[in-house]
UniProtKB/Swiss-Prot annotation:
Organism whose genome encodes this protein: Danio rerio (Zebrafish)
InterPro entries listed in its UniProt record: Cactin_C, Cactin_central
Protein's job: Plays a role in pre-mRNA splicing by facilitating excision of a subset of introns. May be involved in the regulation of innate immune response. Plays a role during early embryonic development. Involved in the formation of the anteroposterior axis with important roles also in neural development.
Biased composition (Acidic residues): 605-617
Superkingdom assignment: Eukaryota
Family membership: Belongs to the CACTIN family.
Subcellular location(s) per record: Nucleus; Cytoplasm
Nucleus in keyword set: yes
Keyword entries, A-Z: Coiled coil, Cytoplasm, Developmental protein, Immunity, Innate immunity, Neurogenesis, Nucleus
Protein name, per record: Splicing factor Cactin
Biased composition (Basic residues): 1-13, 33-46
Stored Pfam families: Cactin_mid (PF10312), CactinC_cactus (PF09732)
Length: 835
């Protein structure tokens, strides 16, 4: 214990001696020797301030300061060393540094000795180590406190010295500033007087004023303000440089001394020497490297500009493509809308035609229905309409004709340009008939007298001029009349020629419809002959040059018969000519009133031309007369046949039964306006009801040979009519679901049948027909379904798929006999796979 106490007292005495040496080592002369001249002191002050700023910028917290103290150096010591290094003239400073170094070395040695002793004491006993640690900690804390107080006293003494120096130097600085400002103002005034002699009130430029103010501010500012201004300027330069380098606001406060990266050359340009050597440009100077980097940056900038231009061009092209696609899409949509509009028009046209058919079938047809049927019959079927279409206007009132005009407009819109000439001609004729009827109503005569009631001179002249002319002739006449009206003249009867021009349109429309009607008749007759295999002959021959009679072998023999035959033929021809002359004469008498001699000459010339050239168009009356003449001549008399000459299956109808059927058909036509359907047609139509898209007609019949019936001698056996359907569909089992889909479906299979057998003339109505399912001898997968009814019907059989039937009515099974129809409907069972 005594040794430990002795050691502790020795260490305490050493530390006290060291503190005395540090305190009393410097003499007052040495301390005052630090006060140098004002210029040197100001320079030293600036350096110390800049160094202080650096040290403050790069200094860390208290932990780092303690680390520096333990590392035998501190910021304050470094500062003292720098200031004493600059003032190497004073010997006192050097002595002070030497003494301080010796004291520090001694201190370090003592600390090392104390550490070694502590280690030894730790090894000797654990309790003594703990106490020694506490003592060492207290010693170090006390020494640190002493050092801190020492620094504070030194800094306060330095501040006092600085204030004293400022007070001494401030009057001298003020005098220097005043002298400088006076010399500058005198020089500026002399320069102004030399250059123009301008007065000071005129004033210098704004730049000179700013410069003067800046100079004045610099002359009057204190050293602290000057230092702050220069630091701010330097900081602004560094900030600008950093902004140019691309630094963000986060890194703007970093400096070479203060940055988290530990980079002492943070603000400088980084040069990767290894990369430069690898590229082979390590020998270049800094200026060349800068030029090279600048050149590379320019190239990159140009490349970026090119890339930007290409991108803009691509965007422009993309916008153009999108615009083109949009235009194409609009065109497609317009086409779709057009097709939809056409479909809508076709639908309305179909509905209008359907309404017309229904009205015609019910016997309440309107004029537009008859016209629509006439114009559609030209293309649809081979039915022949013998009358011209304008004959449907006979007997109509003004209201009916006005309704007809509206219906014609609707058909013209719906047909979209089809049959325009036909509807225009009908419109012209209808408007003319309406005007005639209104004139008759105004004159007080009914529509029955309209043909005979026109007594004006213009109408008789018009009828005499237009009688028997073709469409081309009427068109030429129309052009002549129009040119005559346009030419004018003093003796021209404008009213007559205008009425003539007004009526010629109507006659042109009638002539065009008549010629169209004749063309349609010729085409349909030609098609009928082609279907029947008849050799084509001239259509509607009127005048045939009779070939010269064969020279009789003996004129005496059979001369009486030839004379009789020739006389009869001549008589027939004379009668035909008389009828035609009477008809044409009557028509001319009705139509012609008074005519001028010029028009009579024209008519005679036209009749002469007609006599020379044979007519190519026949009217309905001409055809009737021709057929009547042929019938009278005996060419239509059928040959008489005996019963033995008839085939065995010929069905003979008695005259009374035929007459009754004819009278019944006539009564039905008078009541409904259309022939009713037969019983078998009704049966077929009833069997076709409800036929879906997954059903098809099934008419494959199996022949039954060697079948004899007991009632065959009493009734003639006949086969019944039938209308059968087969139901097909897809079976979506596991295999089909795996290998097929809705776009590529599996093959259809038969799922059921619907048999409709017609027995309208069954003798025994109480006995219902029956069906029998028999196996097929050729193939076990098929069966034969046979139907048996009774007299007068034979059995009938069909070959079907041999599968198990579904007899539940829920699955569509039906077996009934009603209204002369035997129905057998069934579906096959579906087998479900179950584990």
């Amino acid at each position: 214990m005594g040794s430990k106490k002795h050691r502790r007292s020795r260490s305490r005495s050493r530390s006290r001696e060291r503190a005395r040496v540090v305190r009393h080592d410097r003499s007052p002369g040495d301390r005052h020797s630090r006060n140098r001249s004002p210029v040197k002191s100001s320079r030293r002050r600036a350096r110390s301030d800049s160094g202080g700023s650096r040290s403050s910028g790069g200094s860390a917290g208290p932990s780092r300061q303690r680390g520096r103290e333990s590392g035998h150096s501190s910021d304050s010591d470094r500062q003292h060393r720098n200031t004493h290094g600059r003032n190497r003239d004073s010997s006192s400073d050097d002595d002070y540094h030497d003494k301080k170094k010796q004291a520090l070395k001694k201190k370090h040695n003592d600390e090392k000795d104390s550490r070694s002793r502590r280690r030894k004491s730790r090894s000797s006993s654990g309790s003594s180590t703990n106490s020694s640690r506490e003592r060492n900690r207290s010693k170090t804390s006390r020494s640190r406190e002493r050092e801190r107080r020492r620094r504070q006293s030194r800094s306060s003494s330095r501040e006092r010295h600085r204030d004293q120096r400022r007070r001494r130097n401030s009057p001298e600085r003020d005098r220097d500033r005043r002298r400088r400002s006076q010399s500058r103002s005198s020089s500026s005034s002399s320069s102004d007087s030399d250059h123009g002699g301008k007065s000071t009130q005129g004033g210098s430029s704004s730049k000179e004023e700013k410069k003067k103010q800046r100079d004045l501010m610099k002359a009057l500012e204190t050293p602290e303000e000057k230092r702050a201004r220069r630091l701010a300027k330097k900081e602004a330069k560094e900030r600008k440089k950093r902004e140019k380098m691309g630094w963000s606001e986060e890194y703007m406060g970093y400096t070479n001394a203060d940055n988290p990266f530990g980079d002492n050359n943070l603000l400088g340009t980084f040069i990767w020497q290894k990369a430069l050597e690898k590229k082979g440009i390590g020998h270049l100077s800094e200026k060349n490297l800068k030029d090279r980097n600048k050149h590379i940056q320019e190239e990159n900038r140009r490349e970026l500009q090119k890339v930007k231009q290409l991108r803009l061009e691509r965007e422009r092209e993309k916008a153009m493509r999108e615009q083109e696609l949009e235009m194409l899409q609009r065109e497609k949509e317009a086409e779709h809308f057009k097709t939809w509009a056409e479909q809508e028009d076709n639908f309305h046209l179909h509905q209008a035609k359907l309404r017309s058919k229904i009205r015609i079938r019910d016997g309440r047809a309107k004029p537009i229905d008859l016209l629509a049927k006439y114009i559609s019959a030209e293309d649809d079927d081979l039915s022949v309409e013998m009358h011209e279409p304008y004959t449907f206007l006979n007997g109509l009132t003004v209201t009916d004709m006005e309704d007809l005009l509206e219906d014609i407009k609707v058909y013209m819109e719906l047909e979209c340009g089809k049959n325009v000439d036909f509807w225009r001609d009908m419109t012209t004729i209808t408007e003319d008939e309406i005007s005639k009827l209104r004139k008759l109503e105004a004159s007080g005569k009914g529509p029955g007298d309209r043909r005979e009631g026109i007594n004006t001179s213009v109408s008789t002249d018009v009828q005499s001029v237009f009688k028997g002319k073709t469409y081309s002739q009427l068109q030429a006449l129309y052009m002549n009349i129009e040119s005559k009206i346009q030419a004018g003249g003093s003796n021209l009867d404008i009213g007559y020629w205008e009425s003539l021009l007004q009526q010629v349109r109507v006659y042109m429309a009638r002539a065009r419809l008549r010629e169209r009607h004749q063309d349609v008749l010729r085409q349909k007759l030609y098609k009928l002959k082609q279907e029947q295999g008849v050799e084509s002959e001239p259509l509607f021959p009127i005048i045939k040059e009779e070939p010269e009679k064969e020279q009789p072998i003996s004129r005496e023999a059979g001369s009486g018969e030839e004379e009789a035959g020739s006389s009869s033929q001549q008589a027939d021809r004379e009668e035909d000519e008389d009828r035609r002359s009477r008809r044409t004469g009557g028509e001319e008498a009705e139509r012609s009133g008074r005519s001028s001699p010029e028009e009579e000459k024209k008519g005679e010339e036209e009749e002469g031309e007609k006599d020379e050239a044979p007519e190519a168009v026949l009217t309905e009356e001409d055809l009737i007369q021709q057929s009547q003449a042929e019938y009278d001549s005996g060419r239509y008399s059928p040959t008489l046949l005996q019963n033995s000459e008839l085939p065995l299956d010929t069905h003979i109808i008695a005259e009374e039964e035929d007459l009754q059927r004819l009278l019944l058909a006539r009564r039905q036509m008078q009541v409904t306006g259309d022939a009713s359907e037969s019983a078998e047609d009704l049966f077929v139509r009833r069997a076709k009801e409800g036929m879906g898209g997954d059903e098809a007609q099934f008419s494959v019949e199996m022949p039954l040979t060697g079948k004899m019936y007991l009632w065959a001698d009493k009734y003639r056996p006949r086969k019944p009519r039938f209308f059968n359907r087969v139901h097909t569909g897809f079976e979506w089992n596991k295999y089909n679901q795996t290998h097929y889909d809705f776009d590529n479906p599996p093959p259809k299979i038969v799922q059921g049948y619907k048999f409709n057998i017609f027995y309208p003339d069954l003798i025994d109505k109480r006995s219902t027909p029956q069906y029998f399912l028999e196996p097929c001898p050729d193939n076990k997968d098929f069966g034969i379904l046979r139907f048996h009814a009774g007299p007068p019907y034979e059995d009938i059989a069909f070959k079907i798929v041999n599968r198990e039937w579904e007899y539940s009515h829920r699955h569509g099974f039906r077996c009934q006999f009603a209204n002369g129809i035997f129905q057998l409907w069934f579906h096959f069972k579906r087998y479900r796979y179950r584990r």
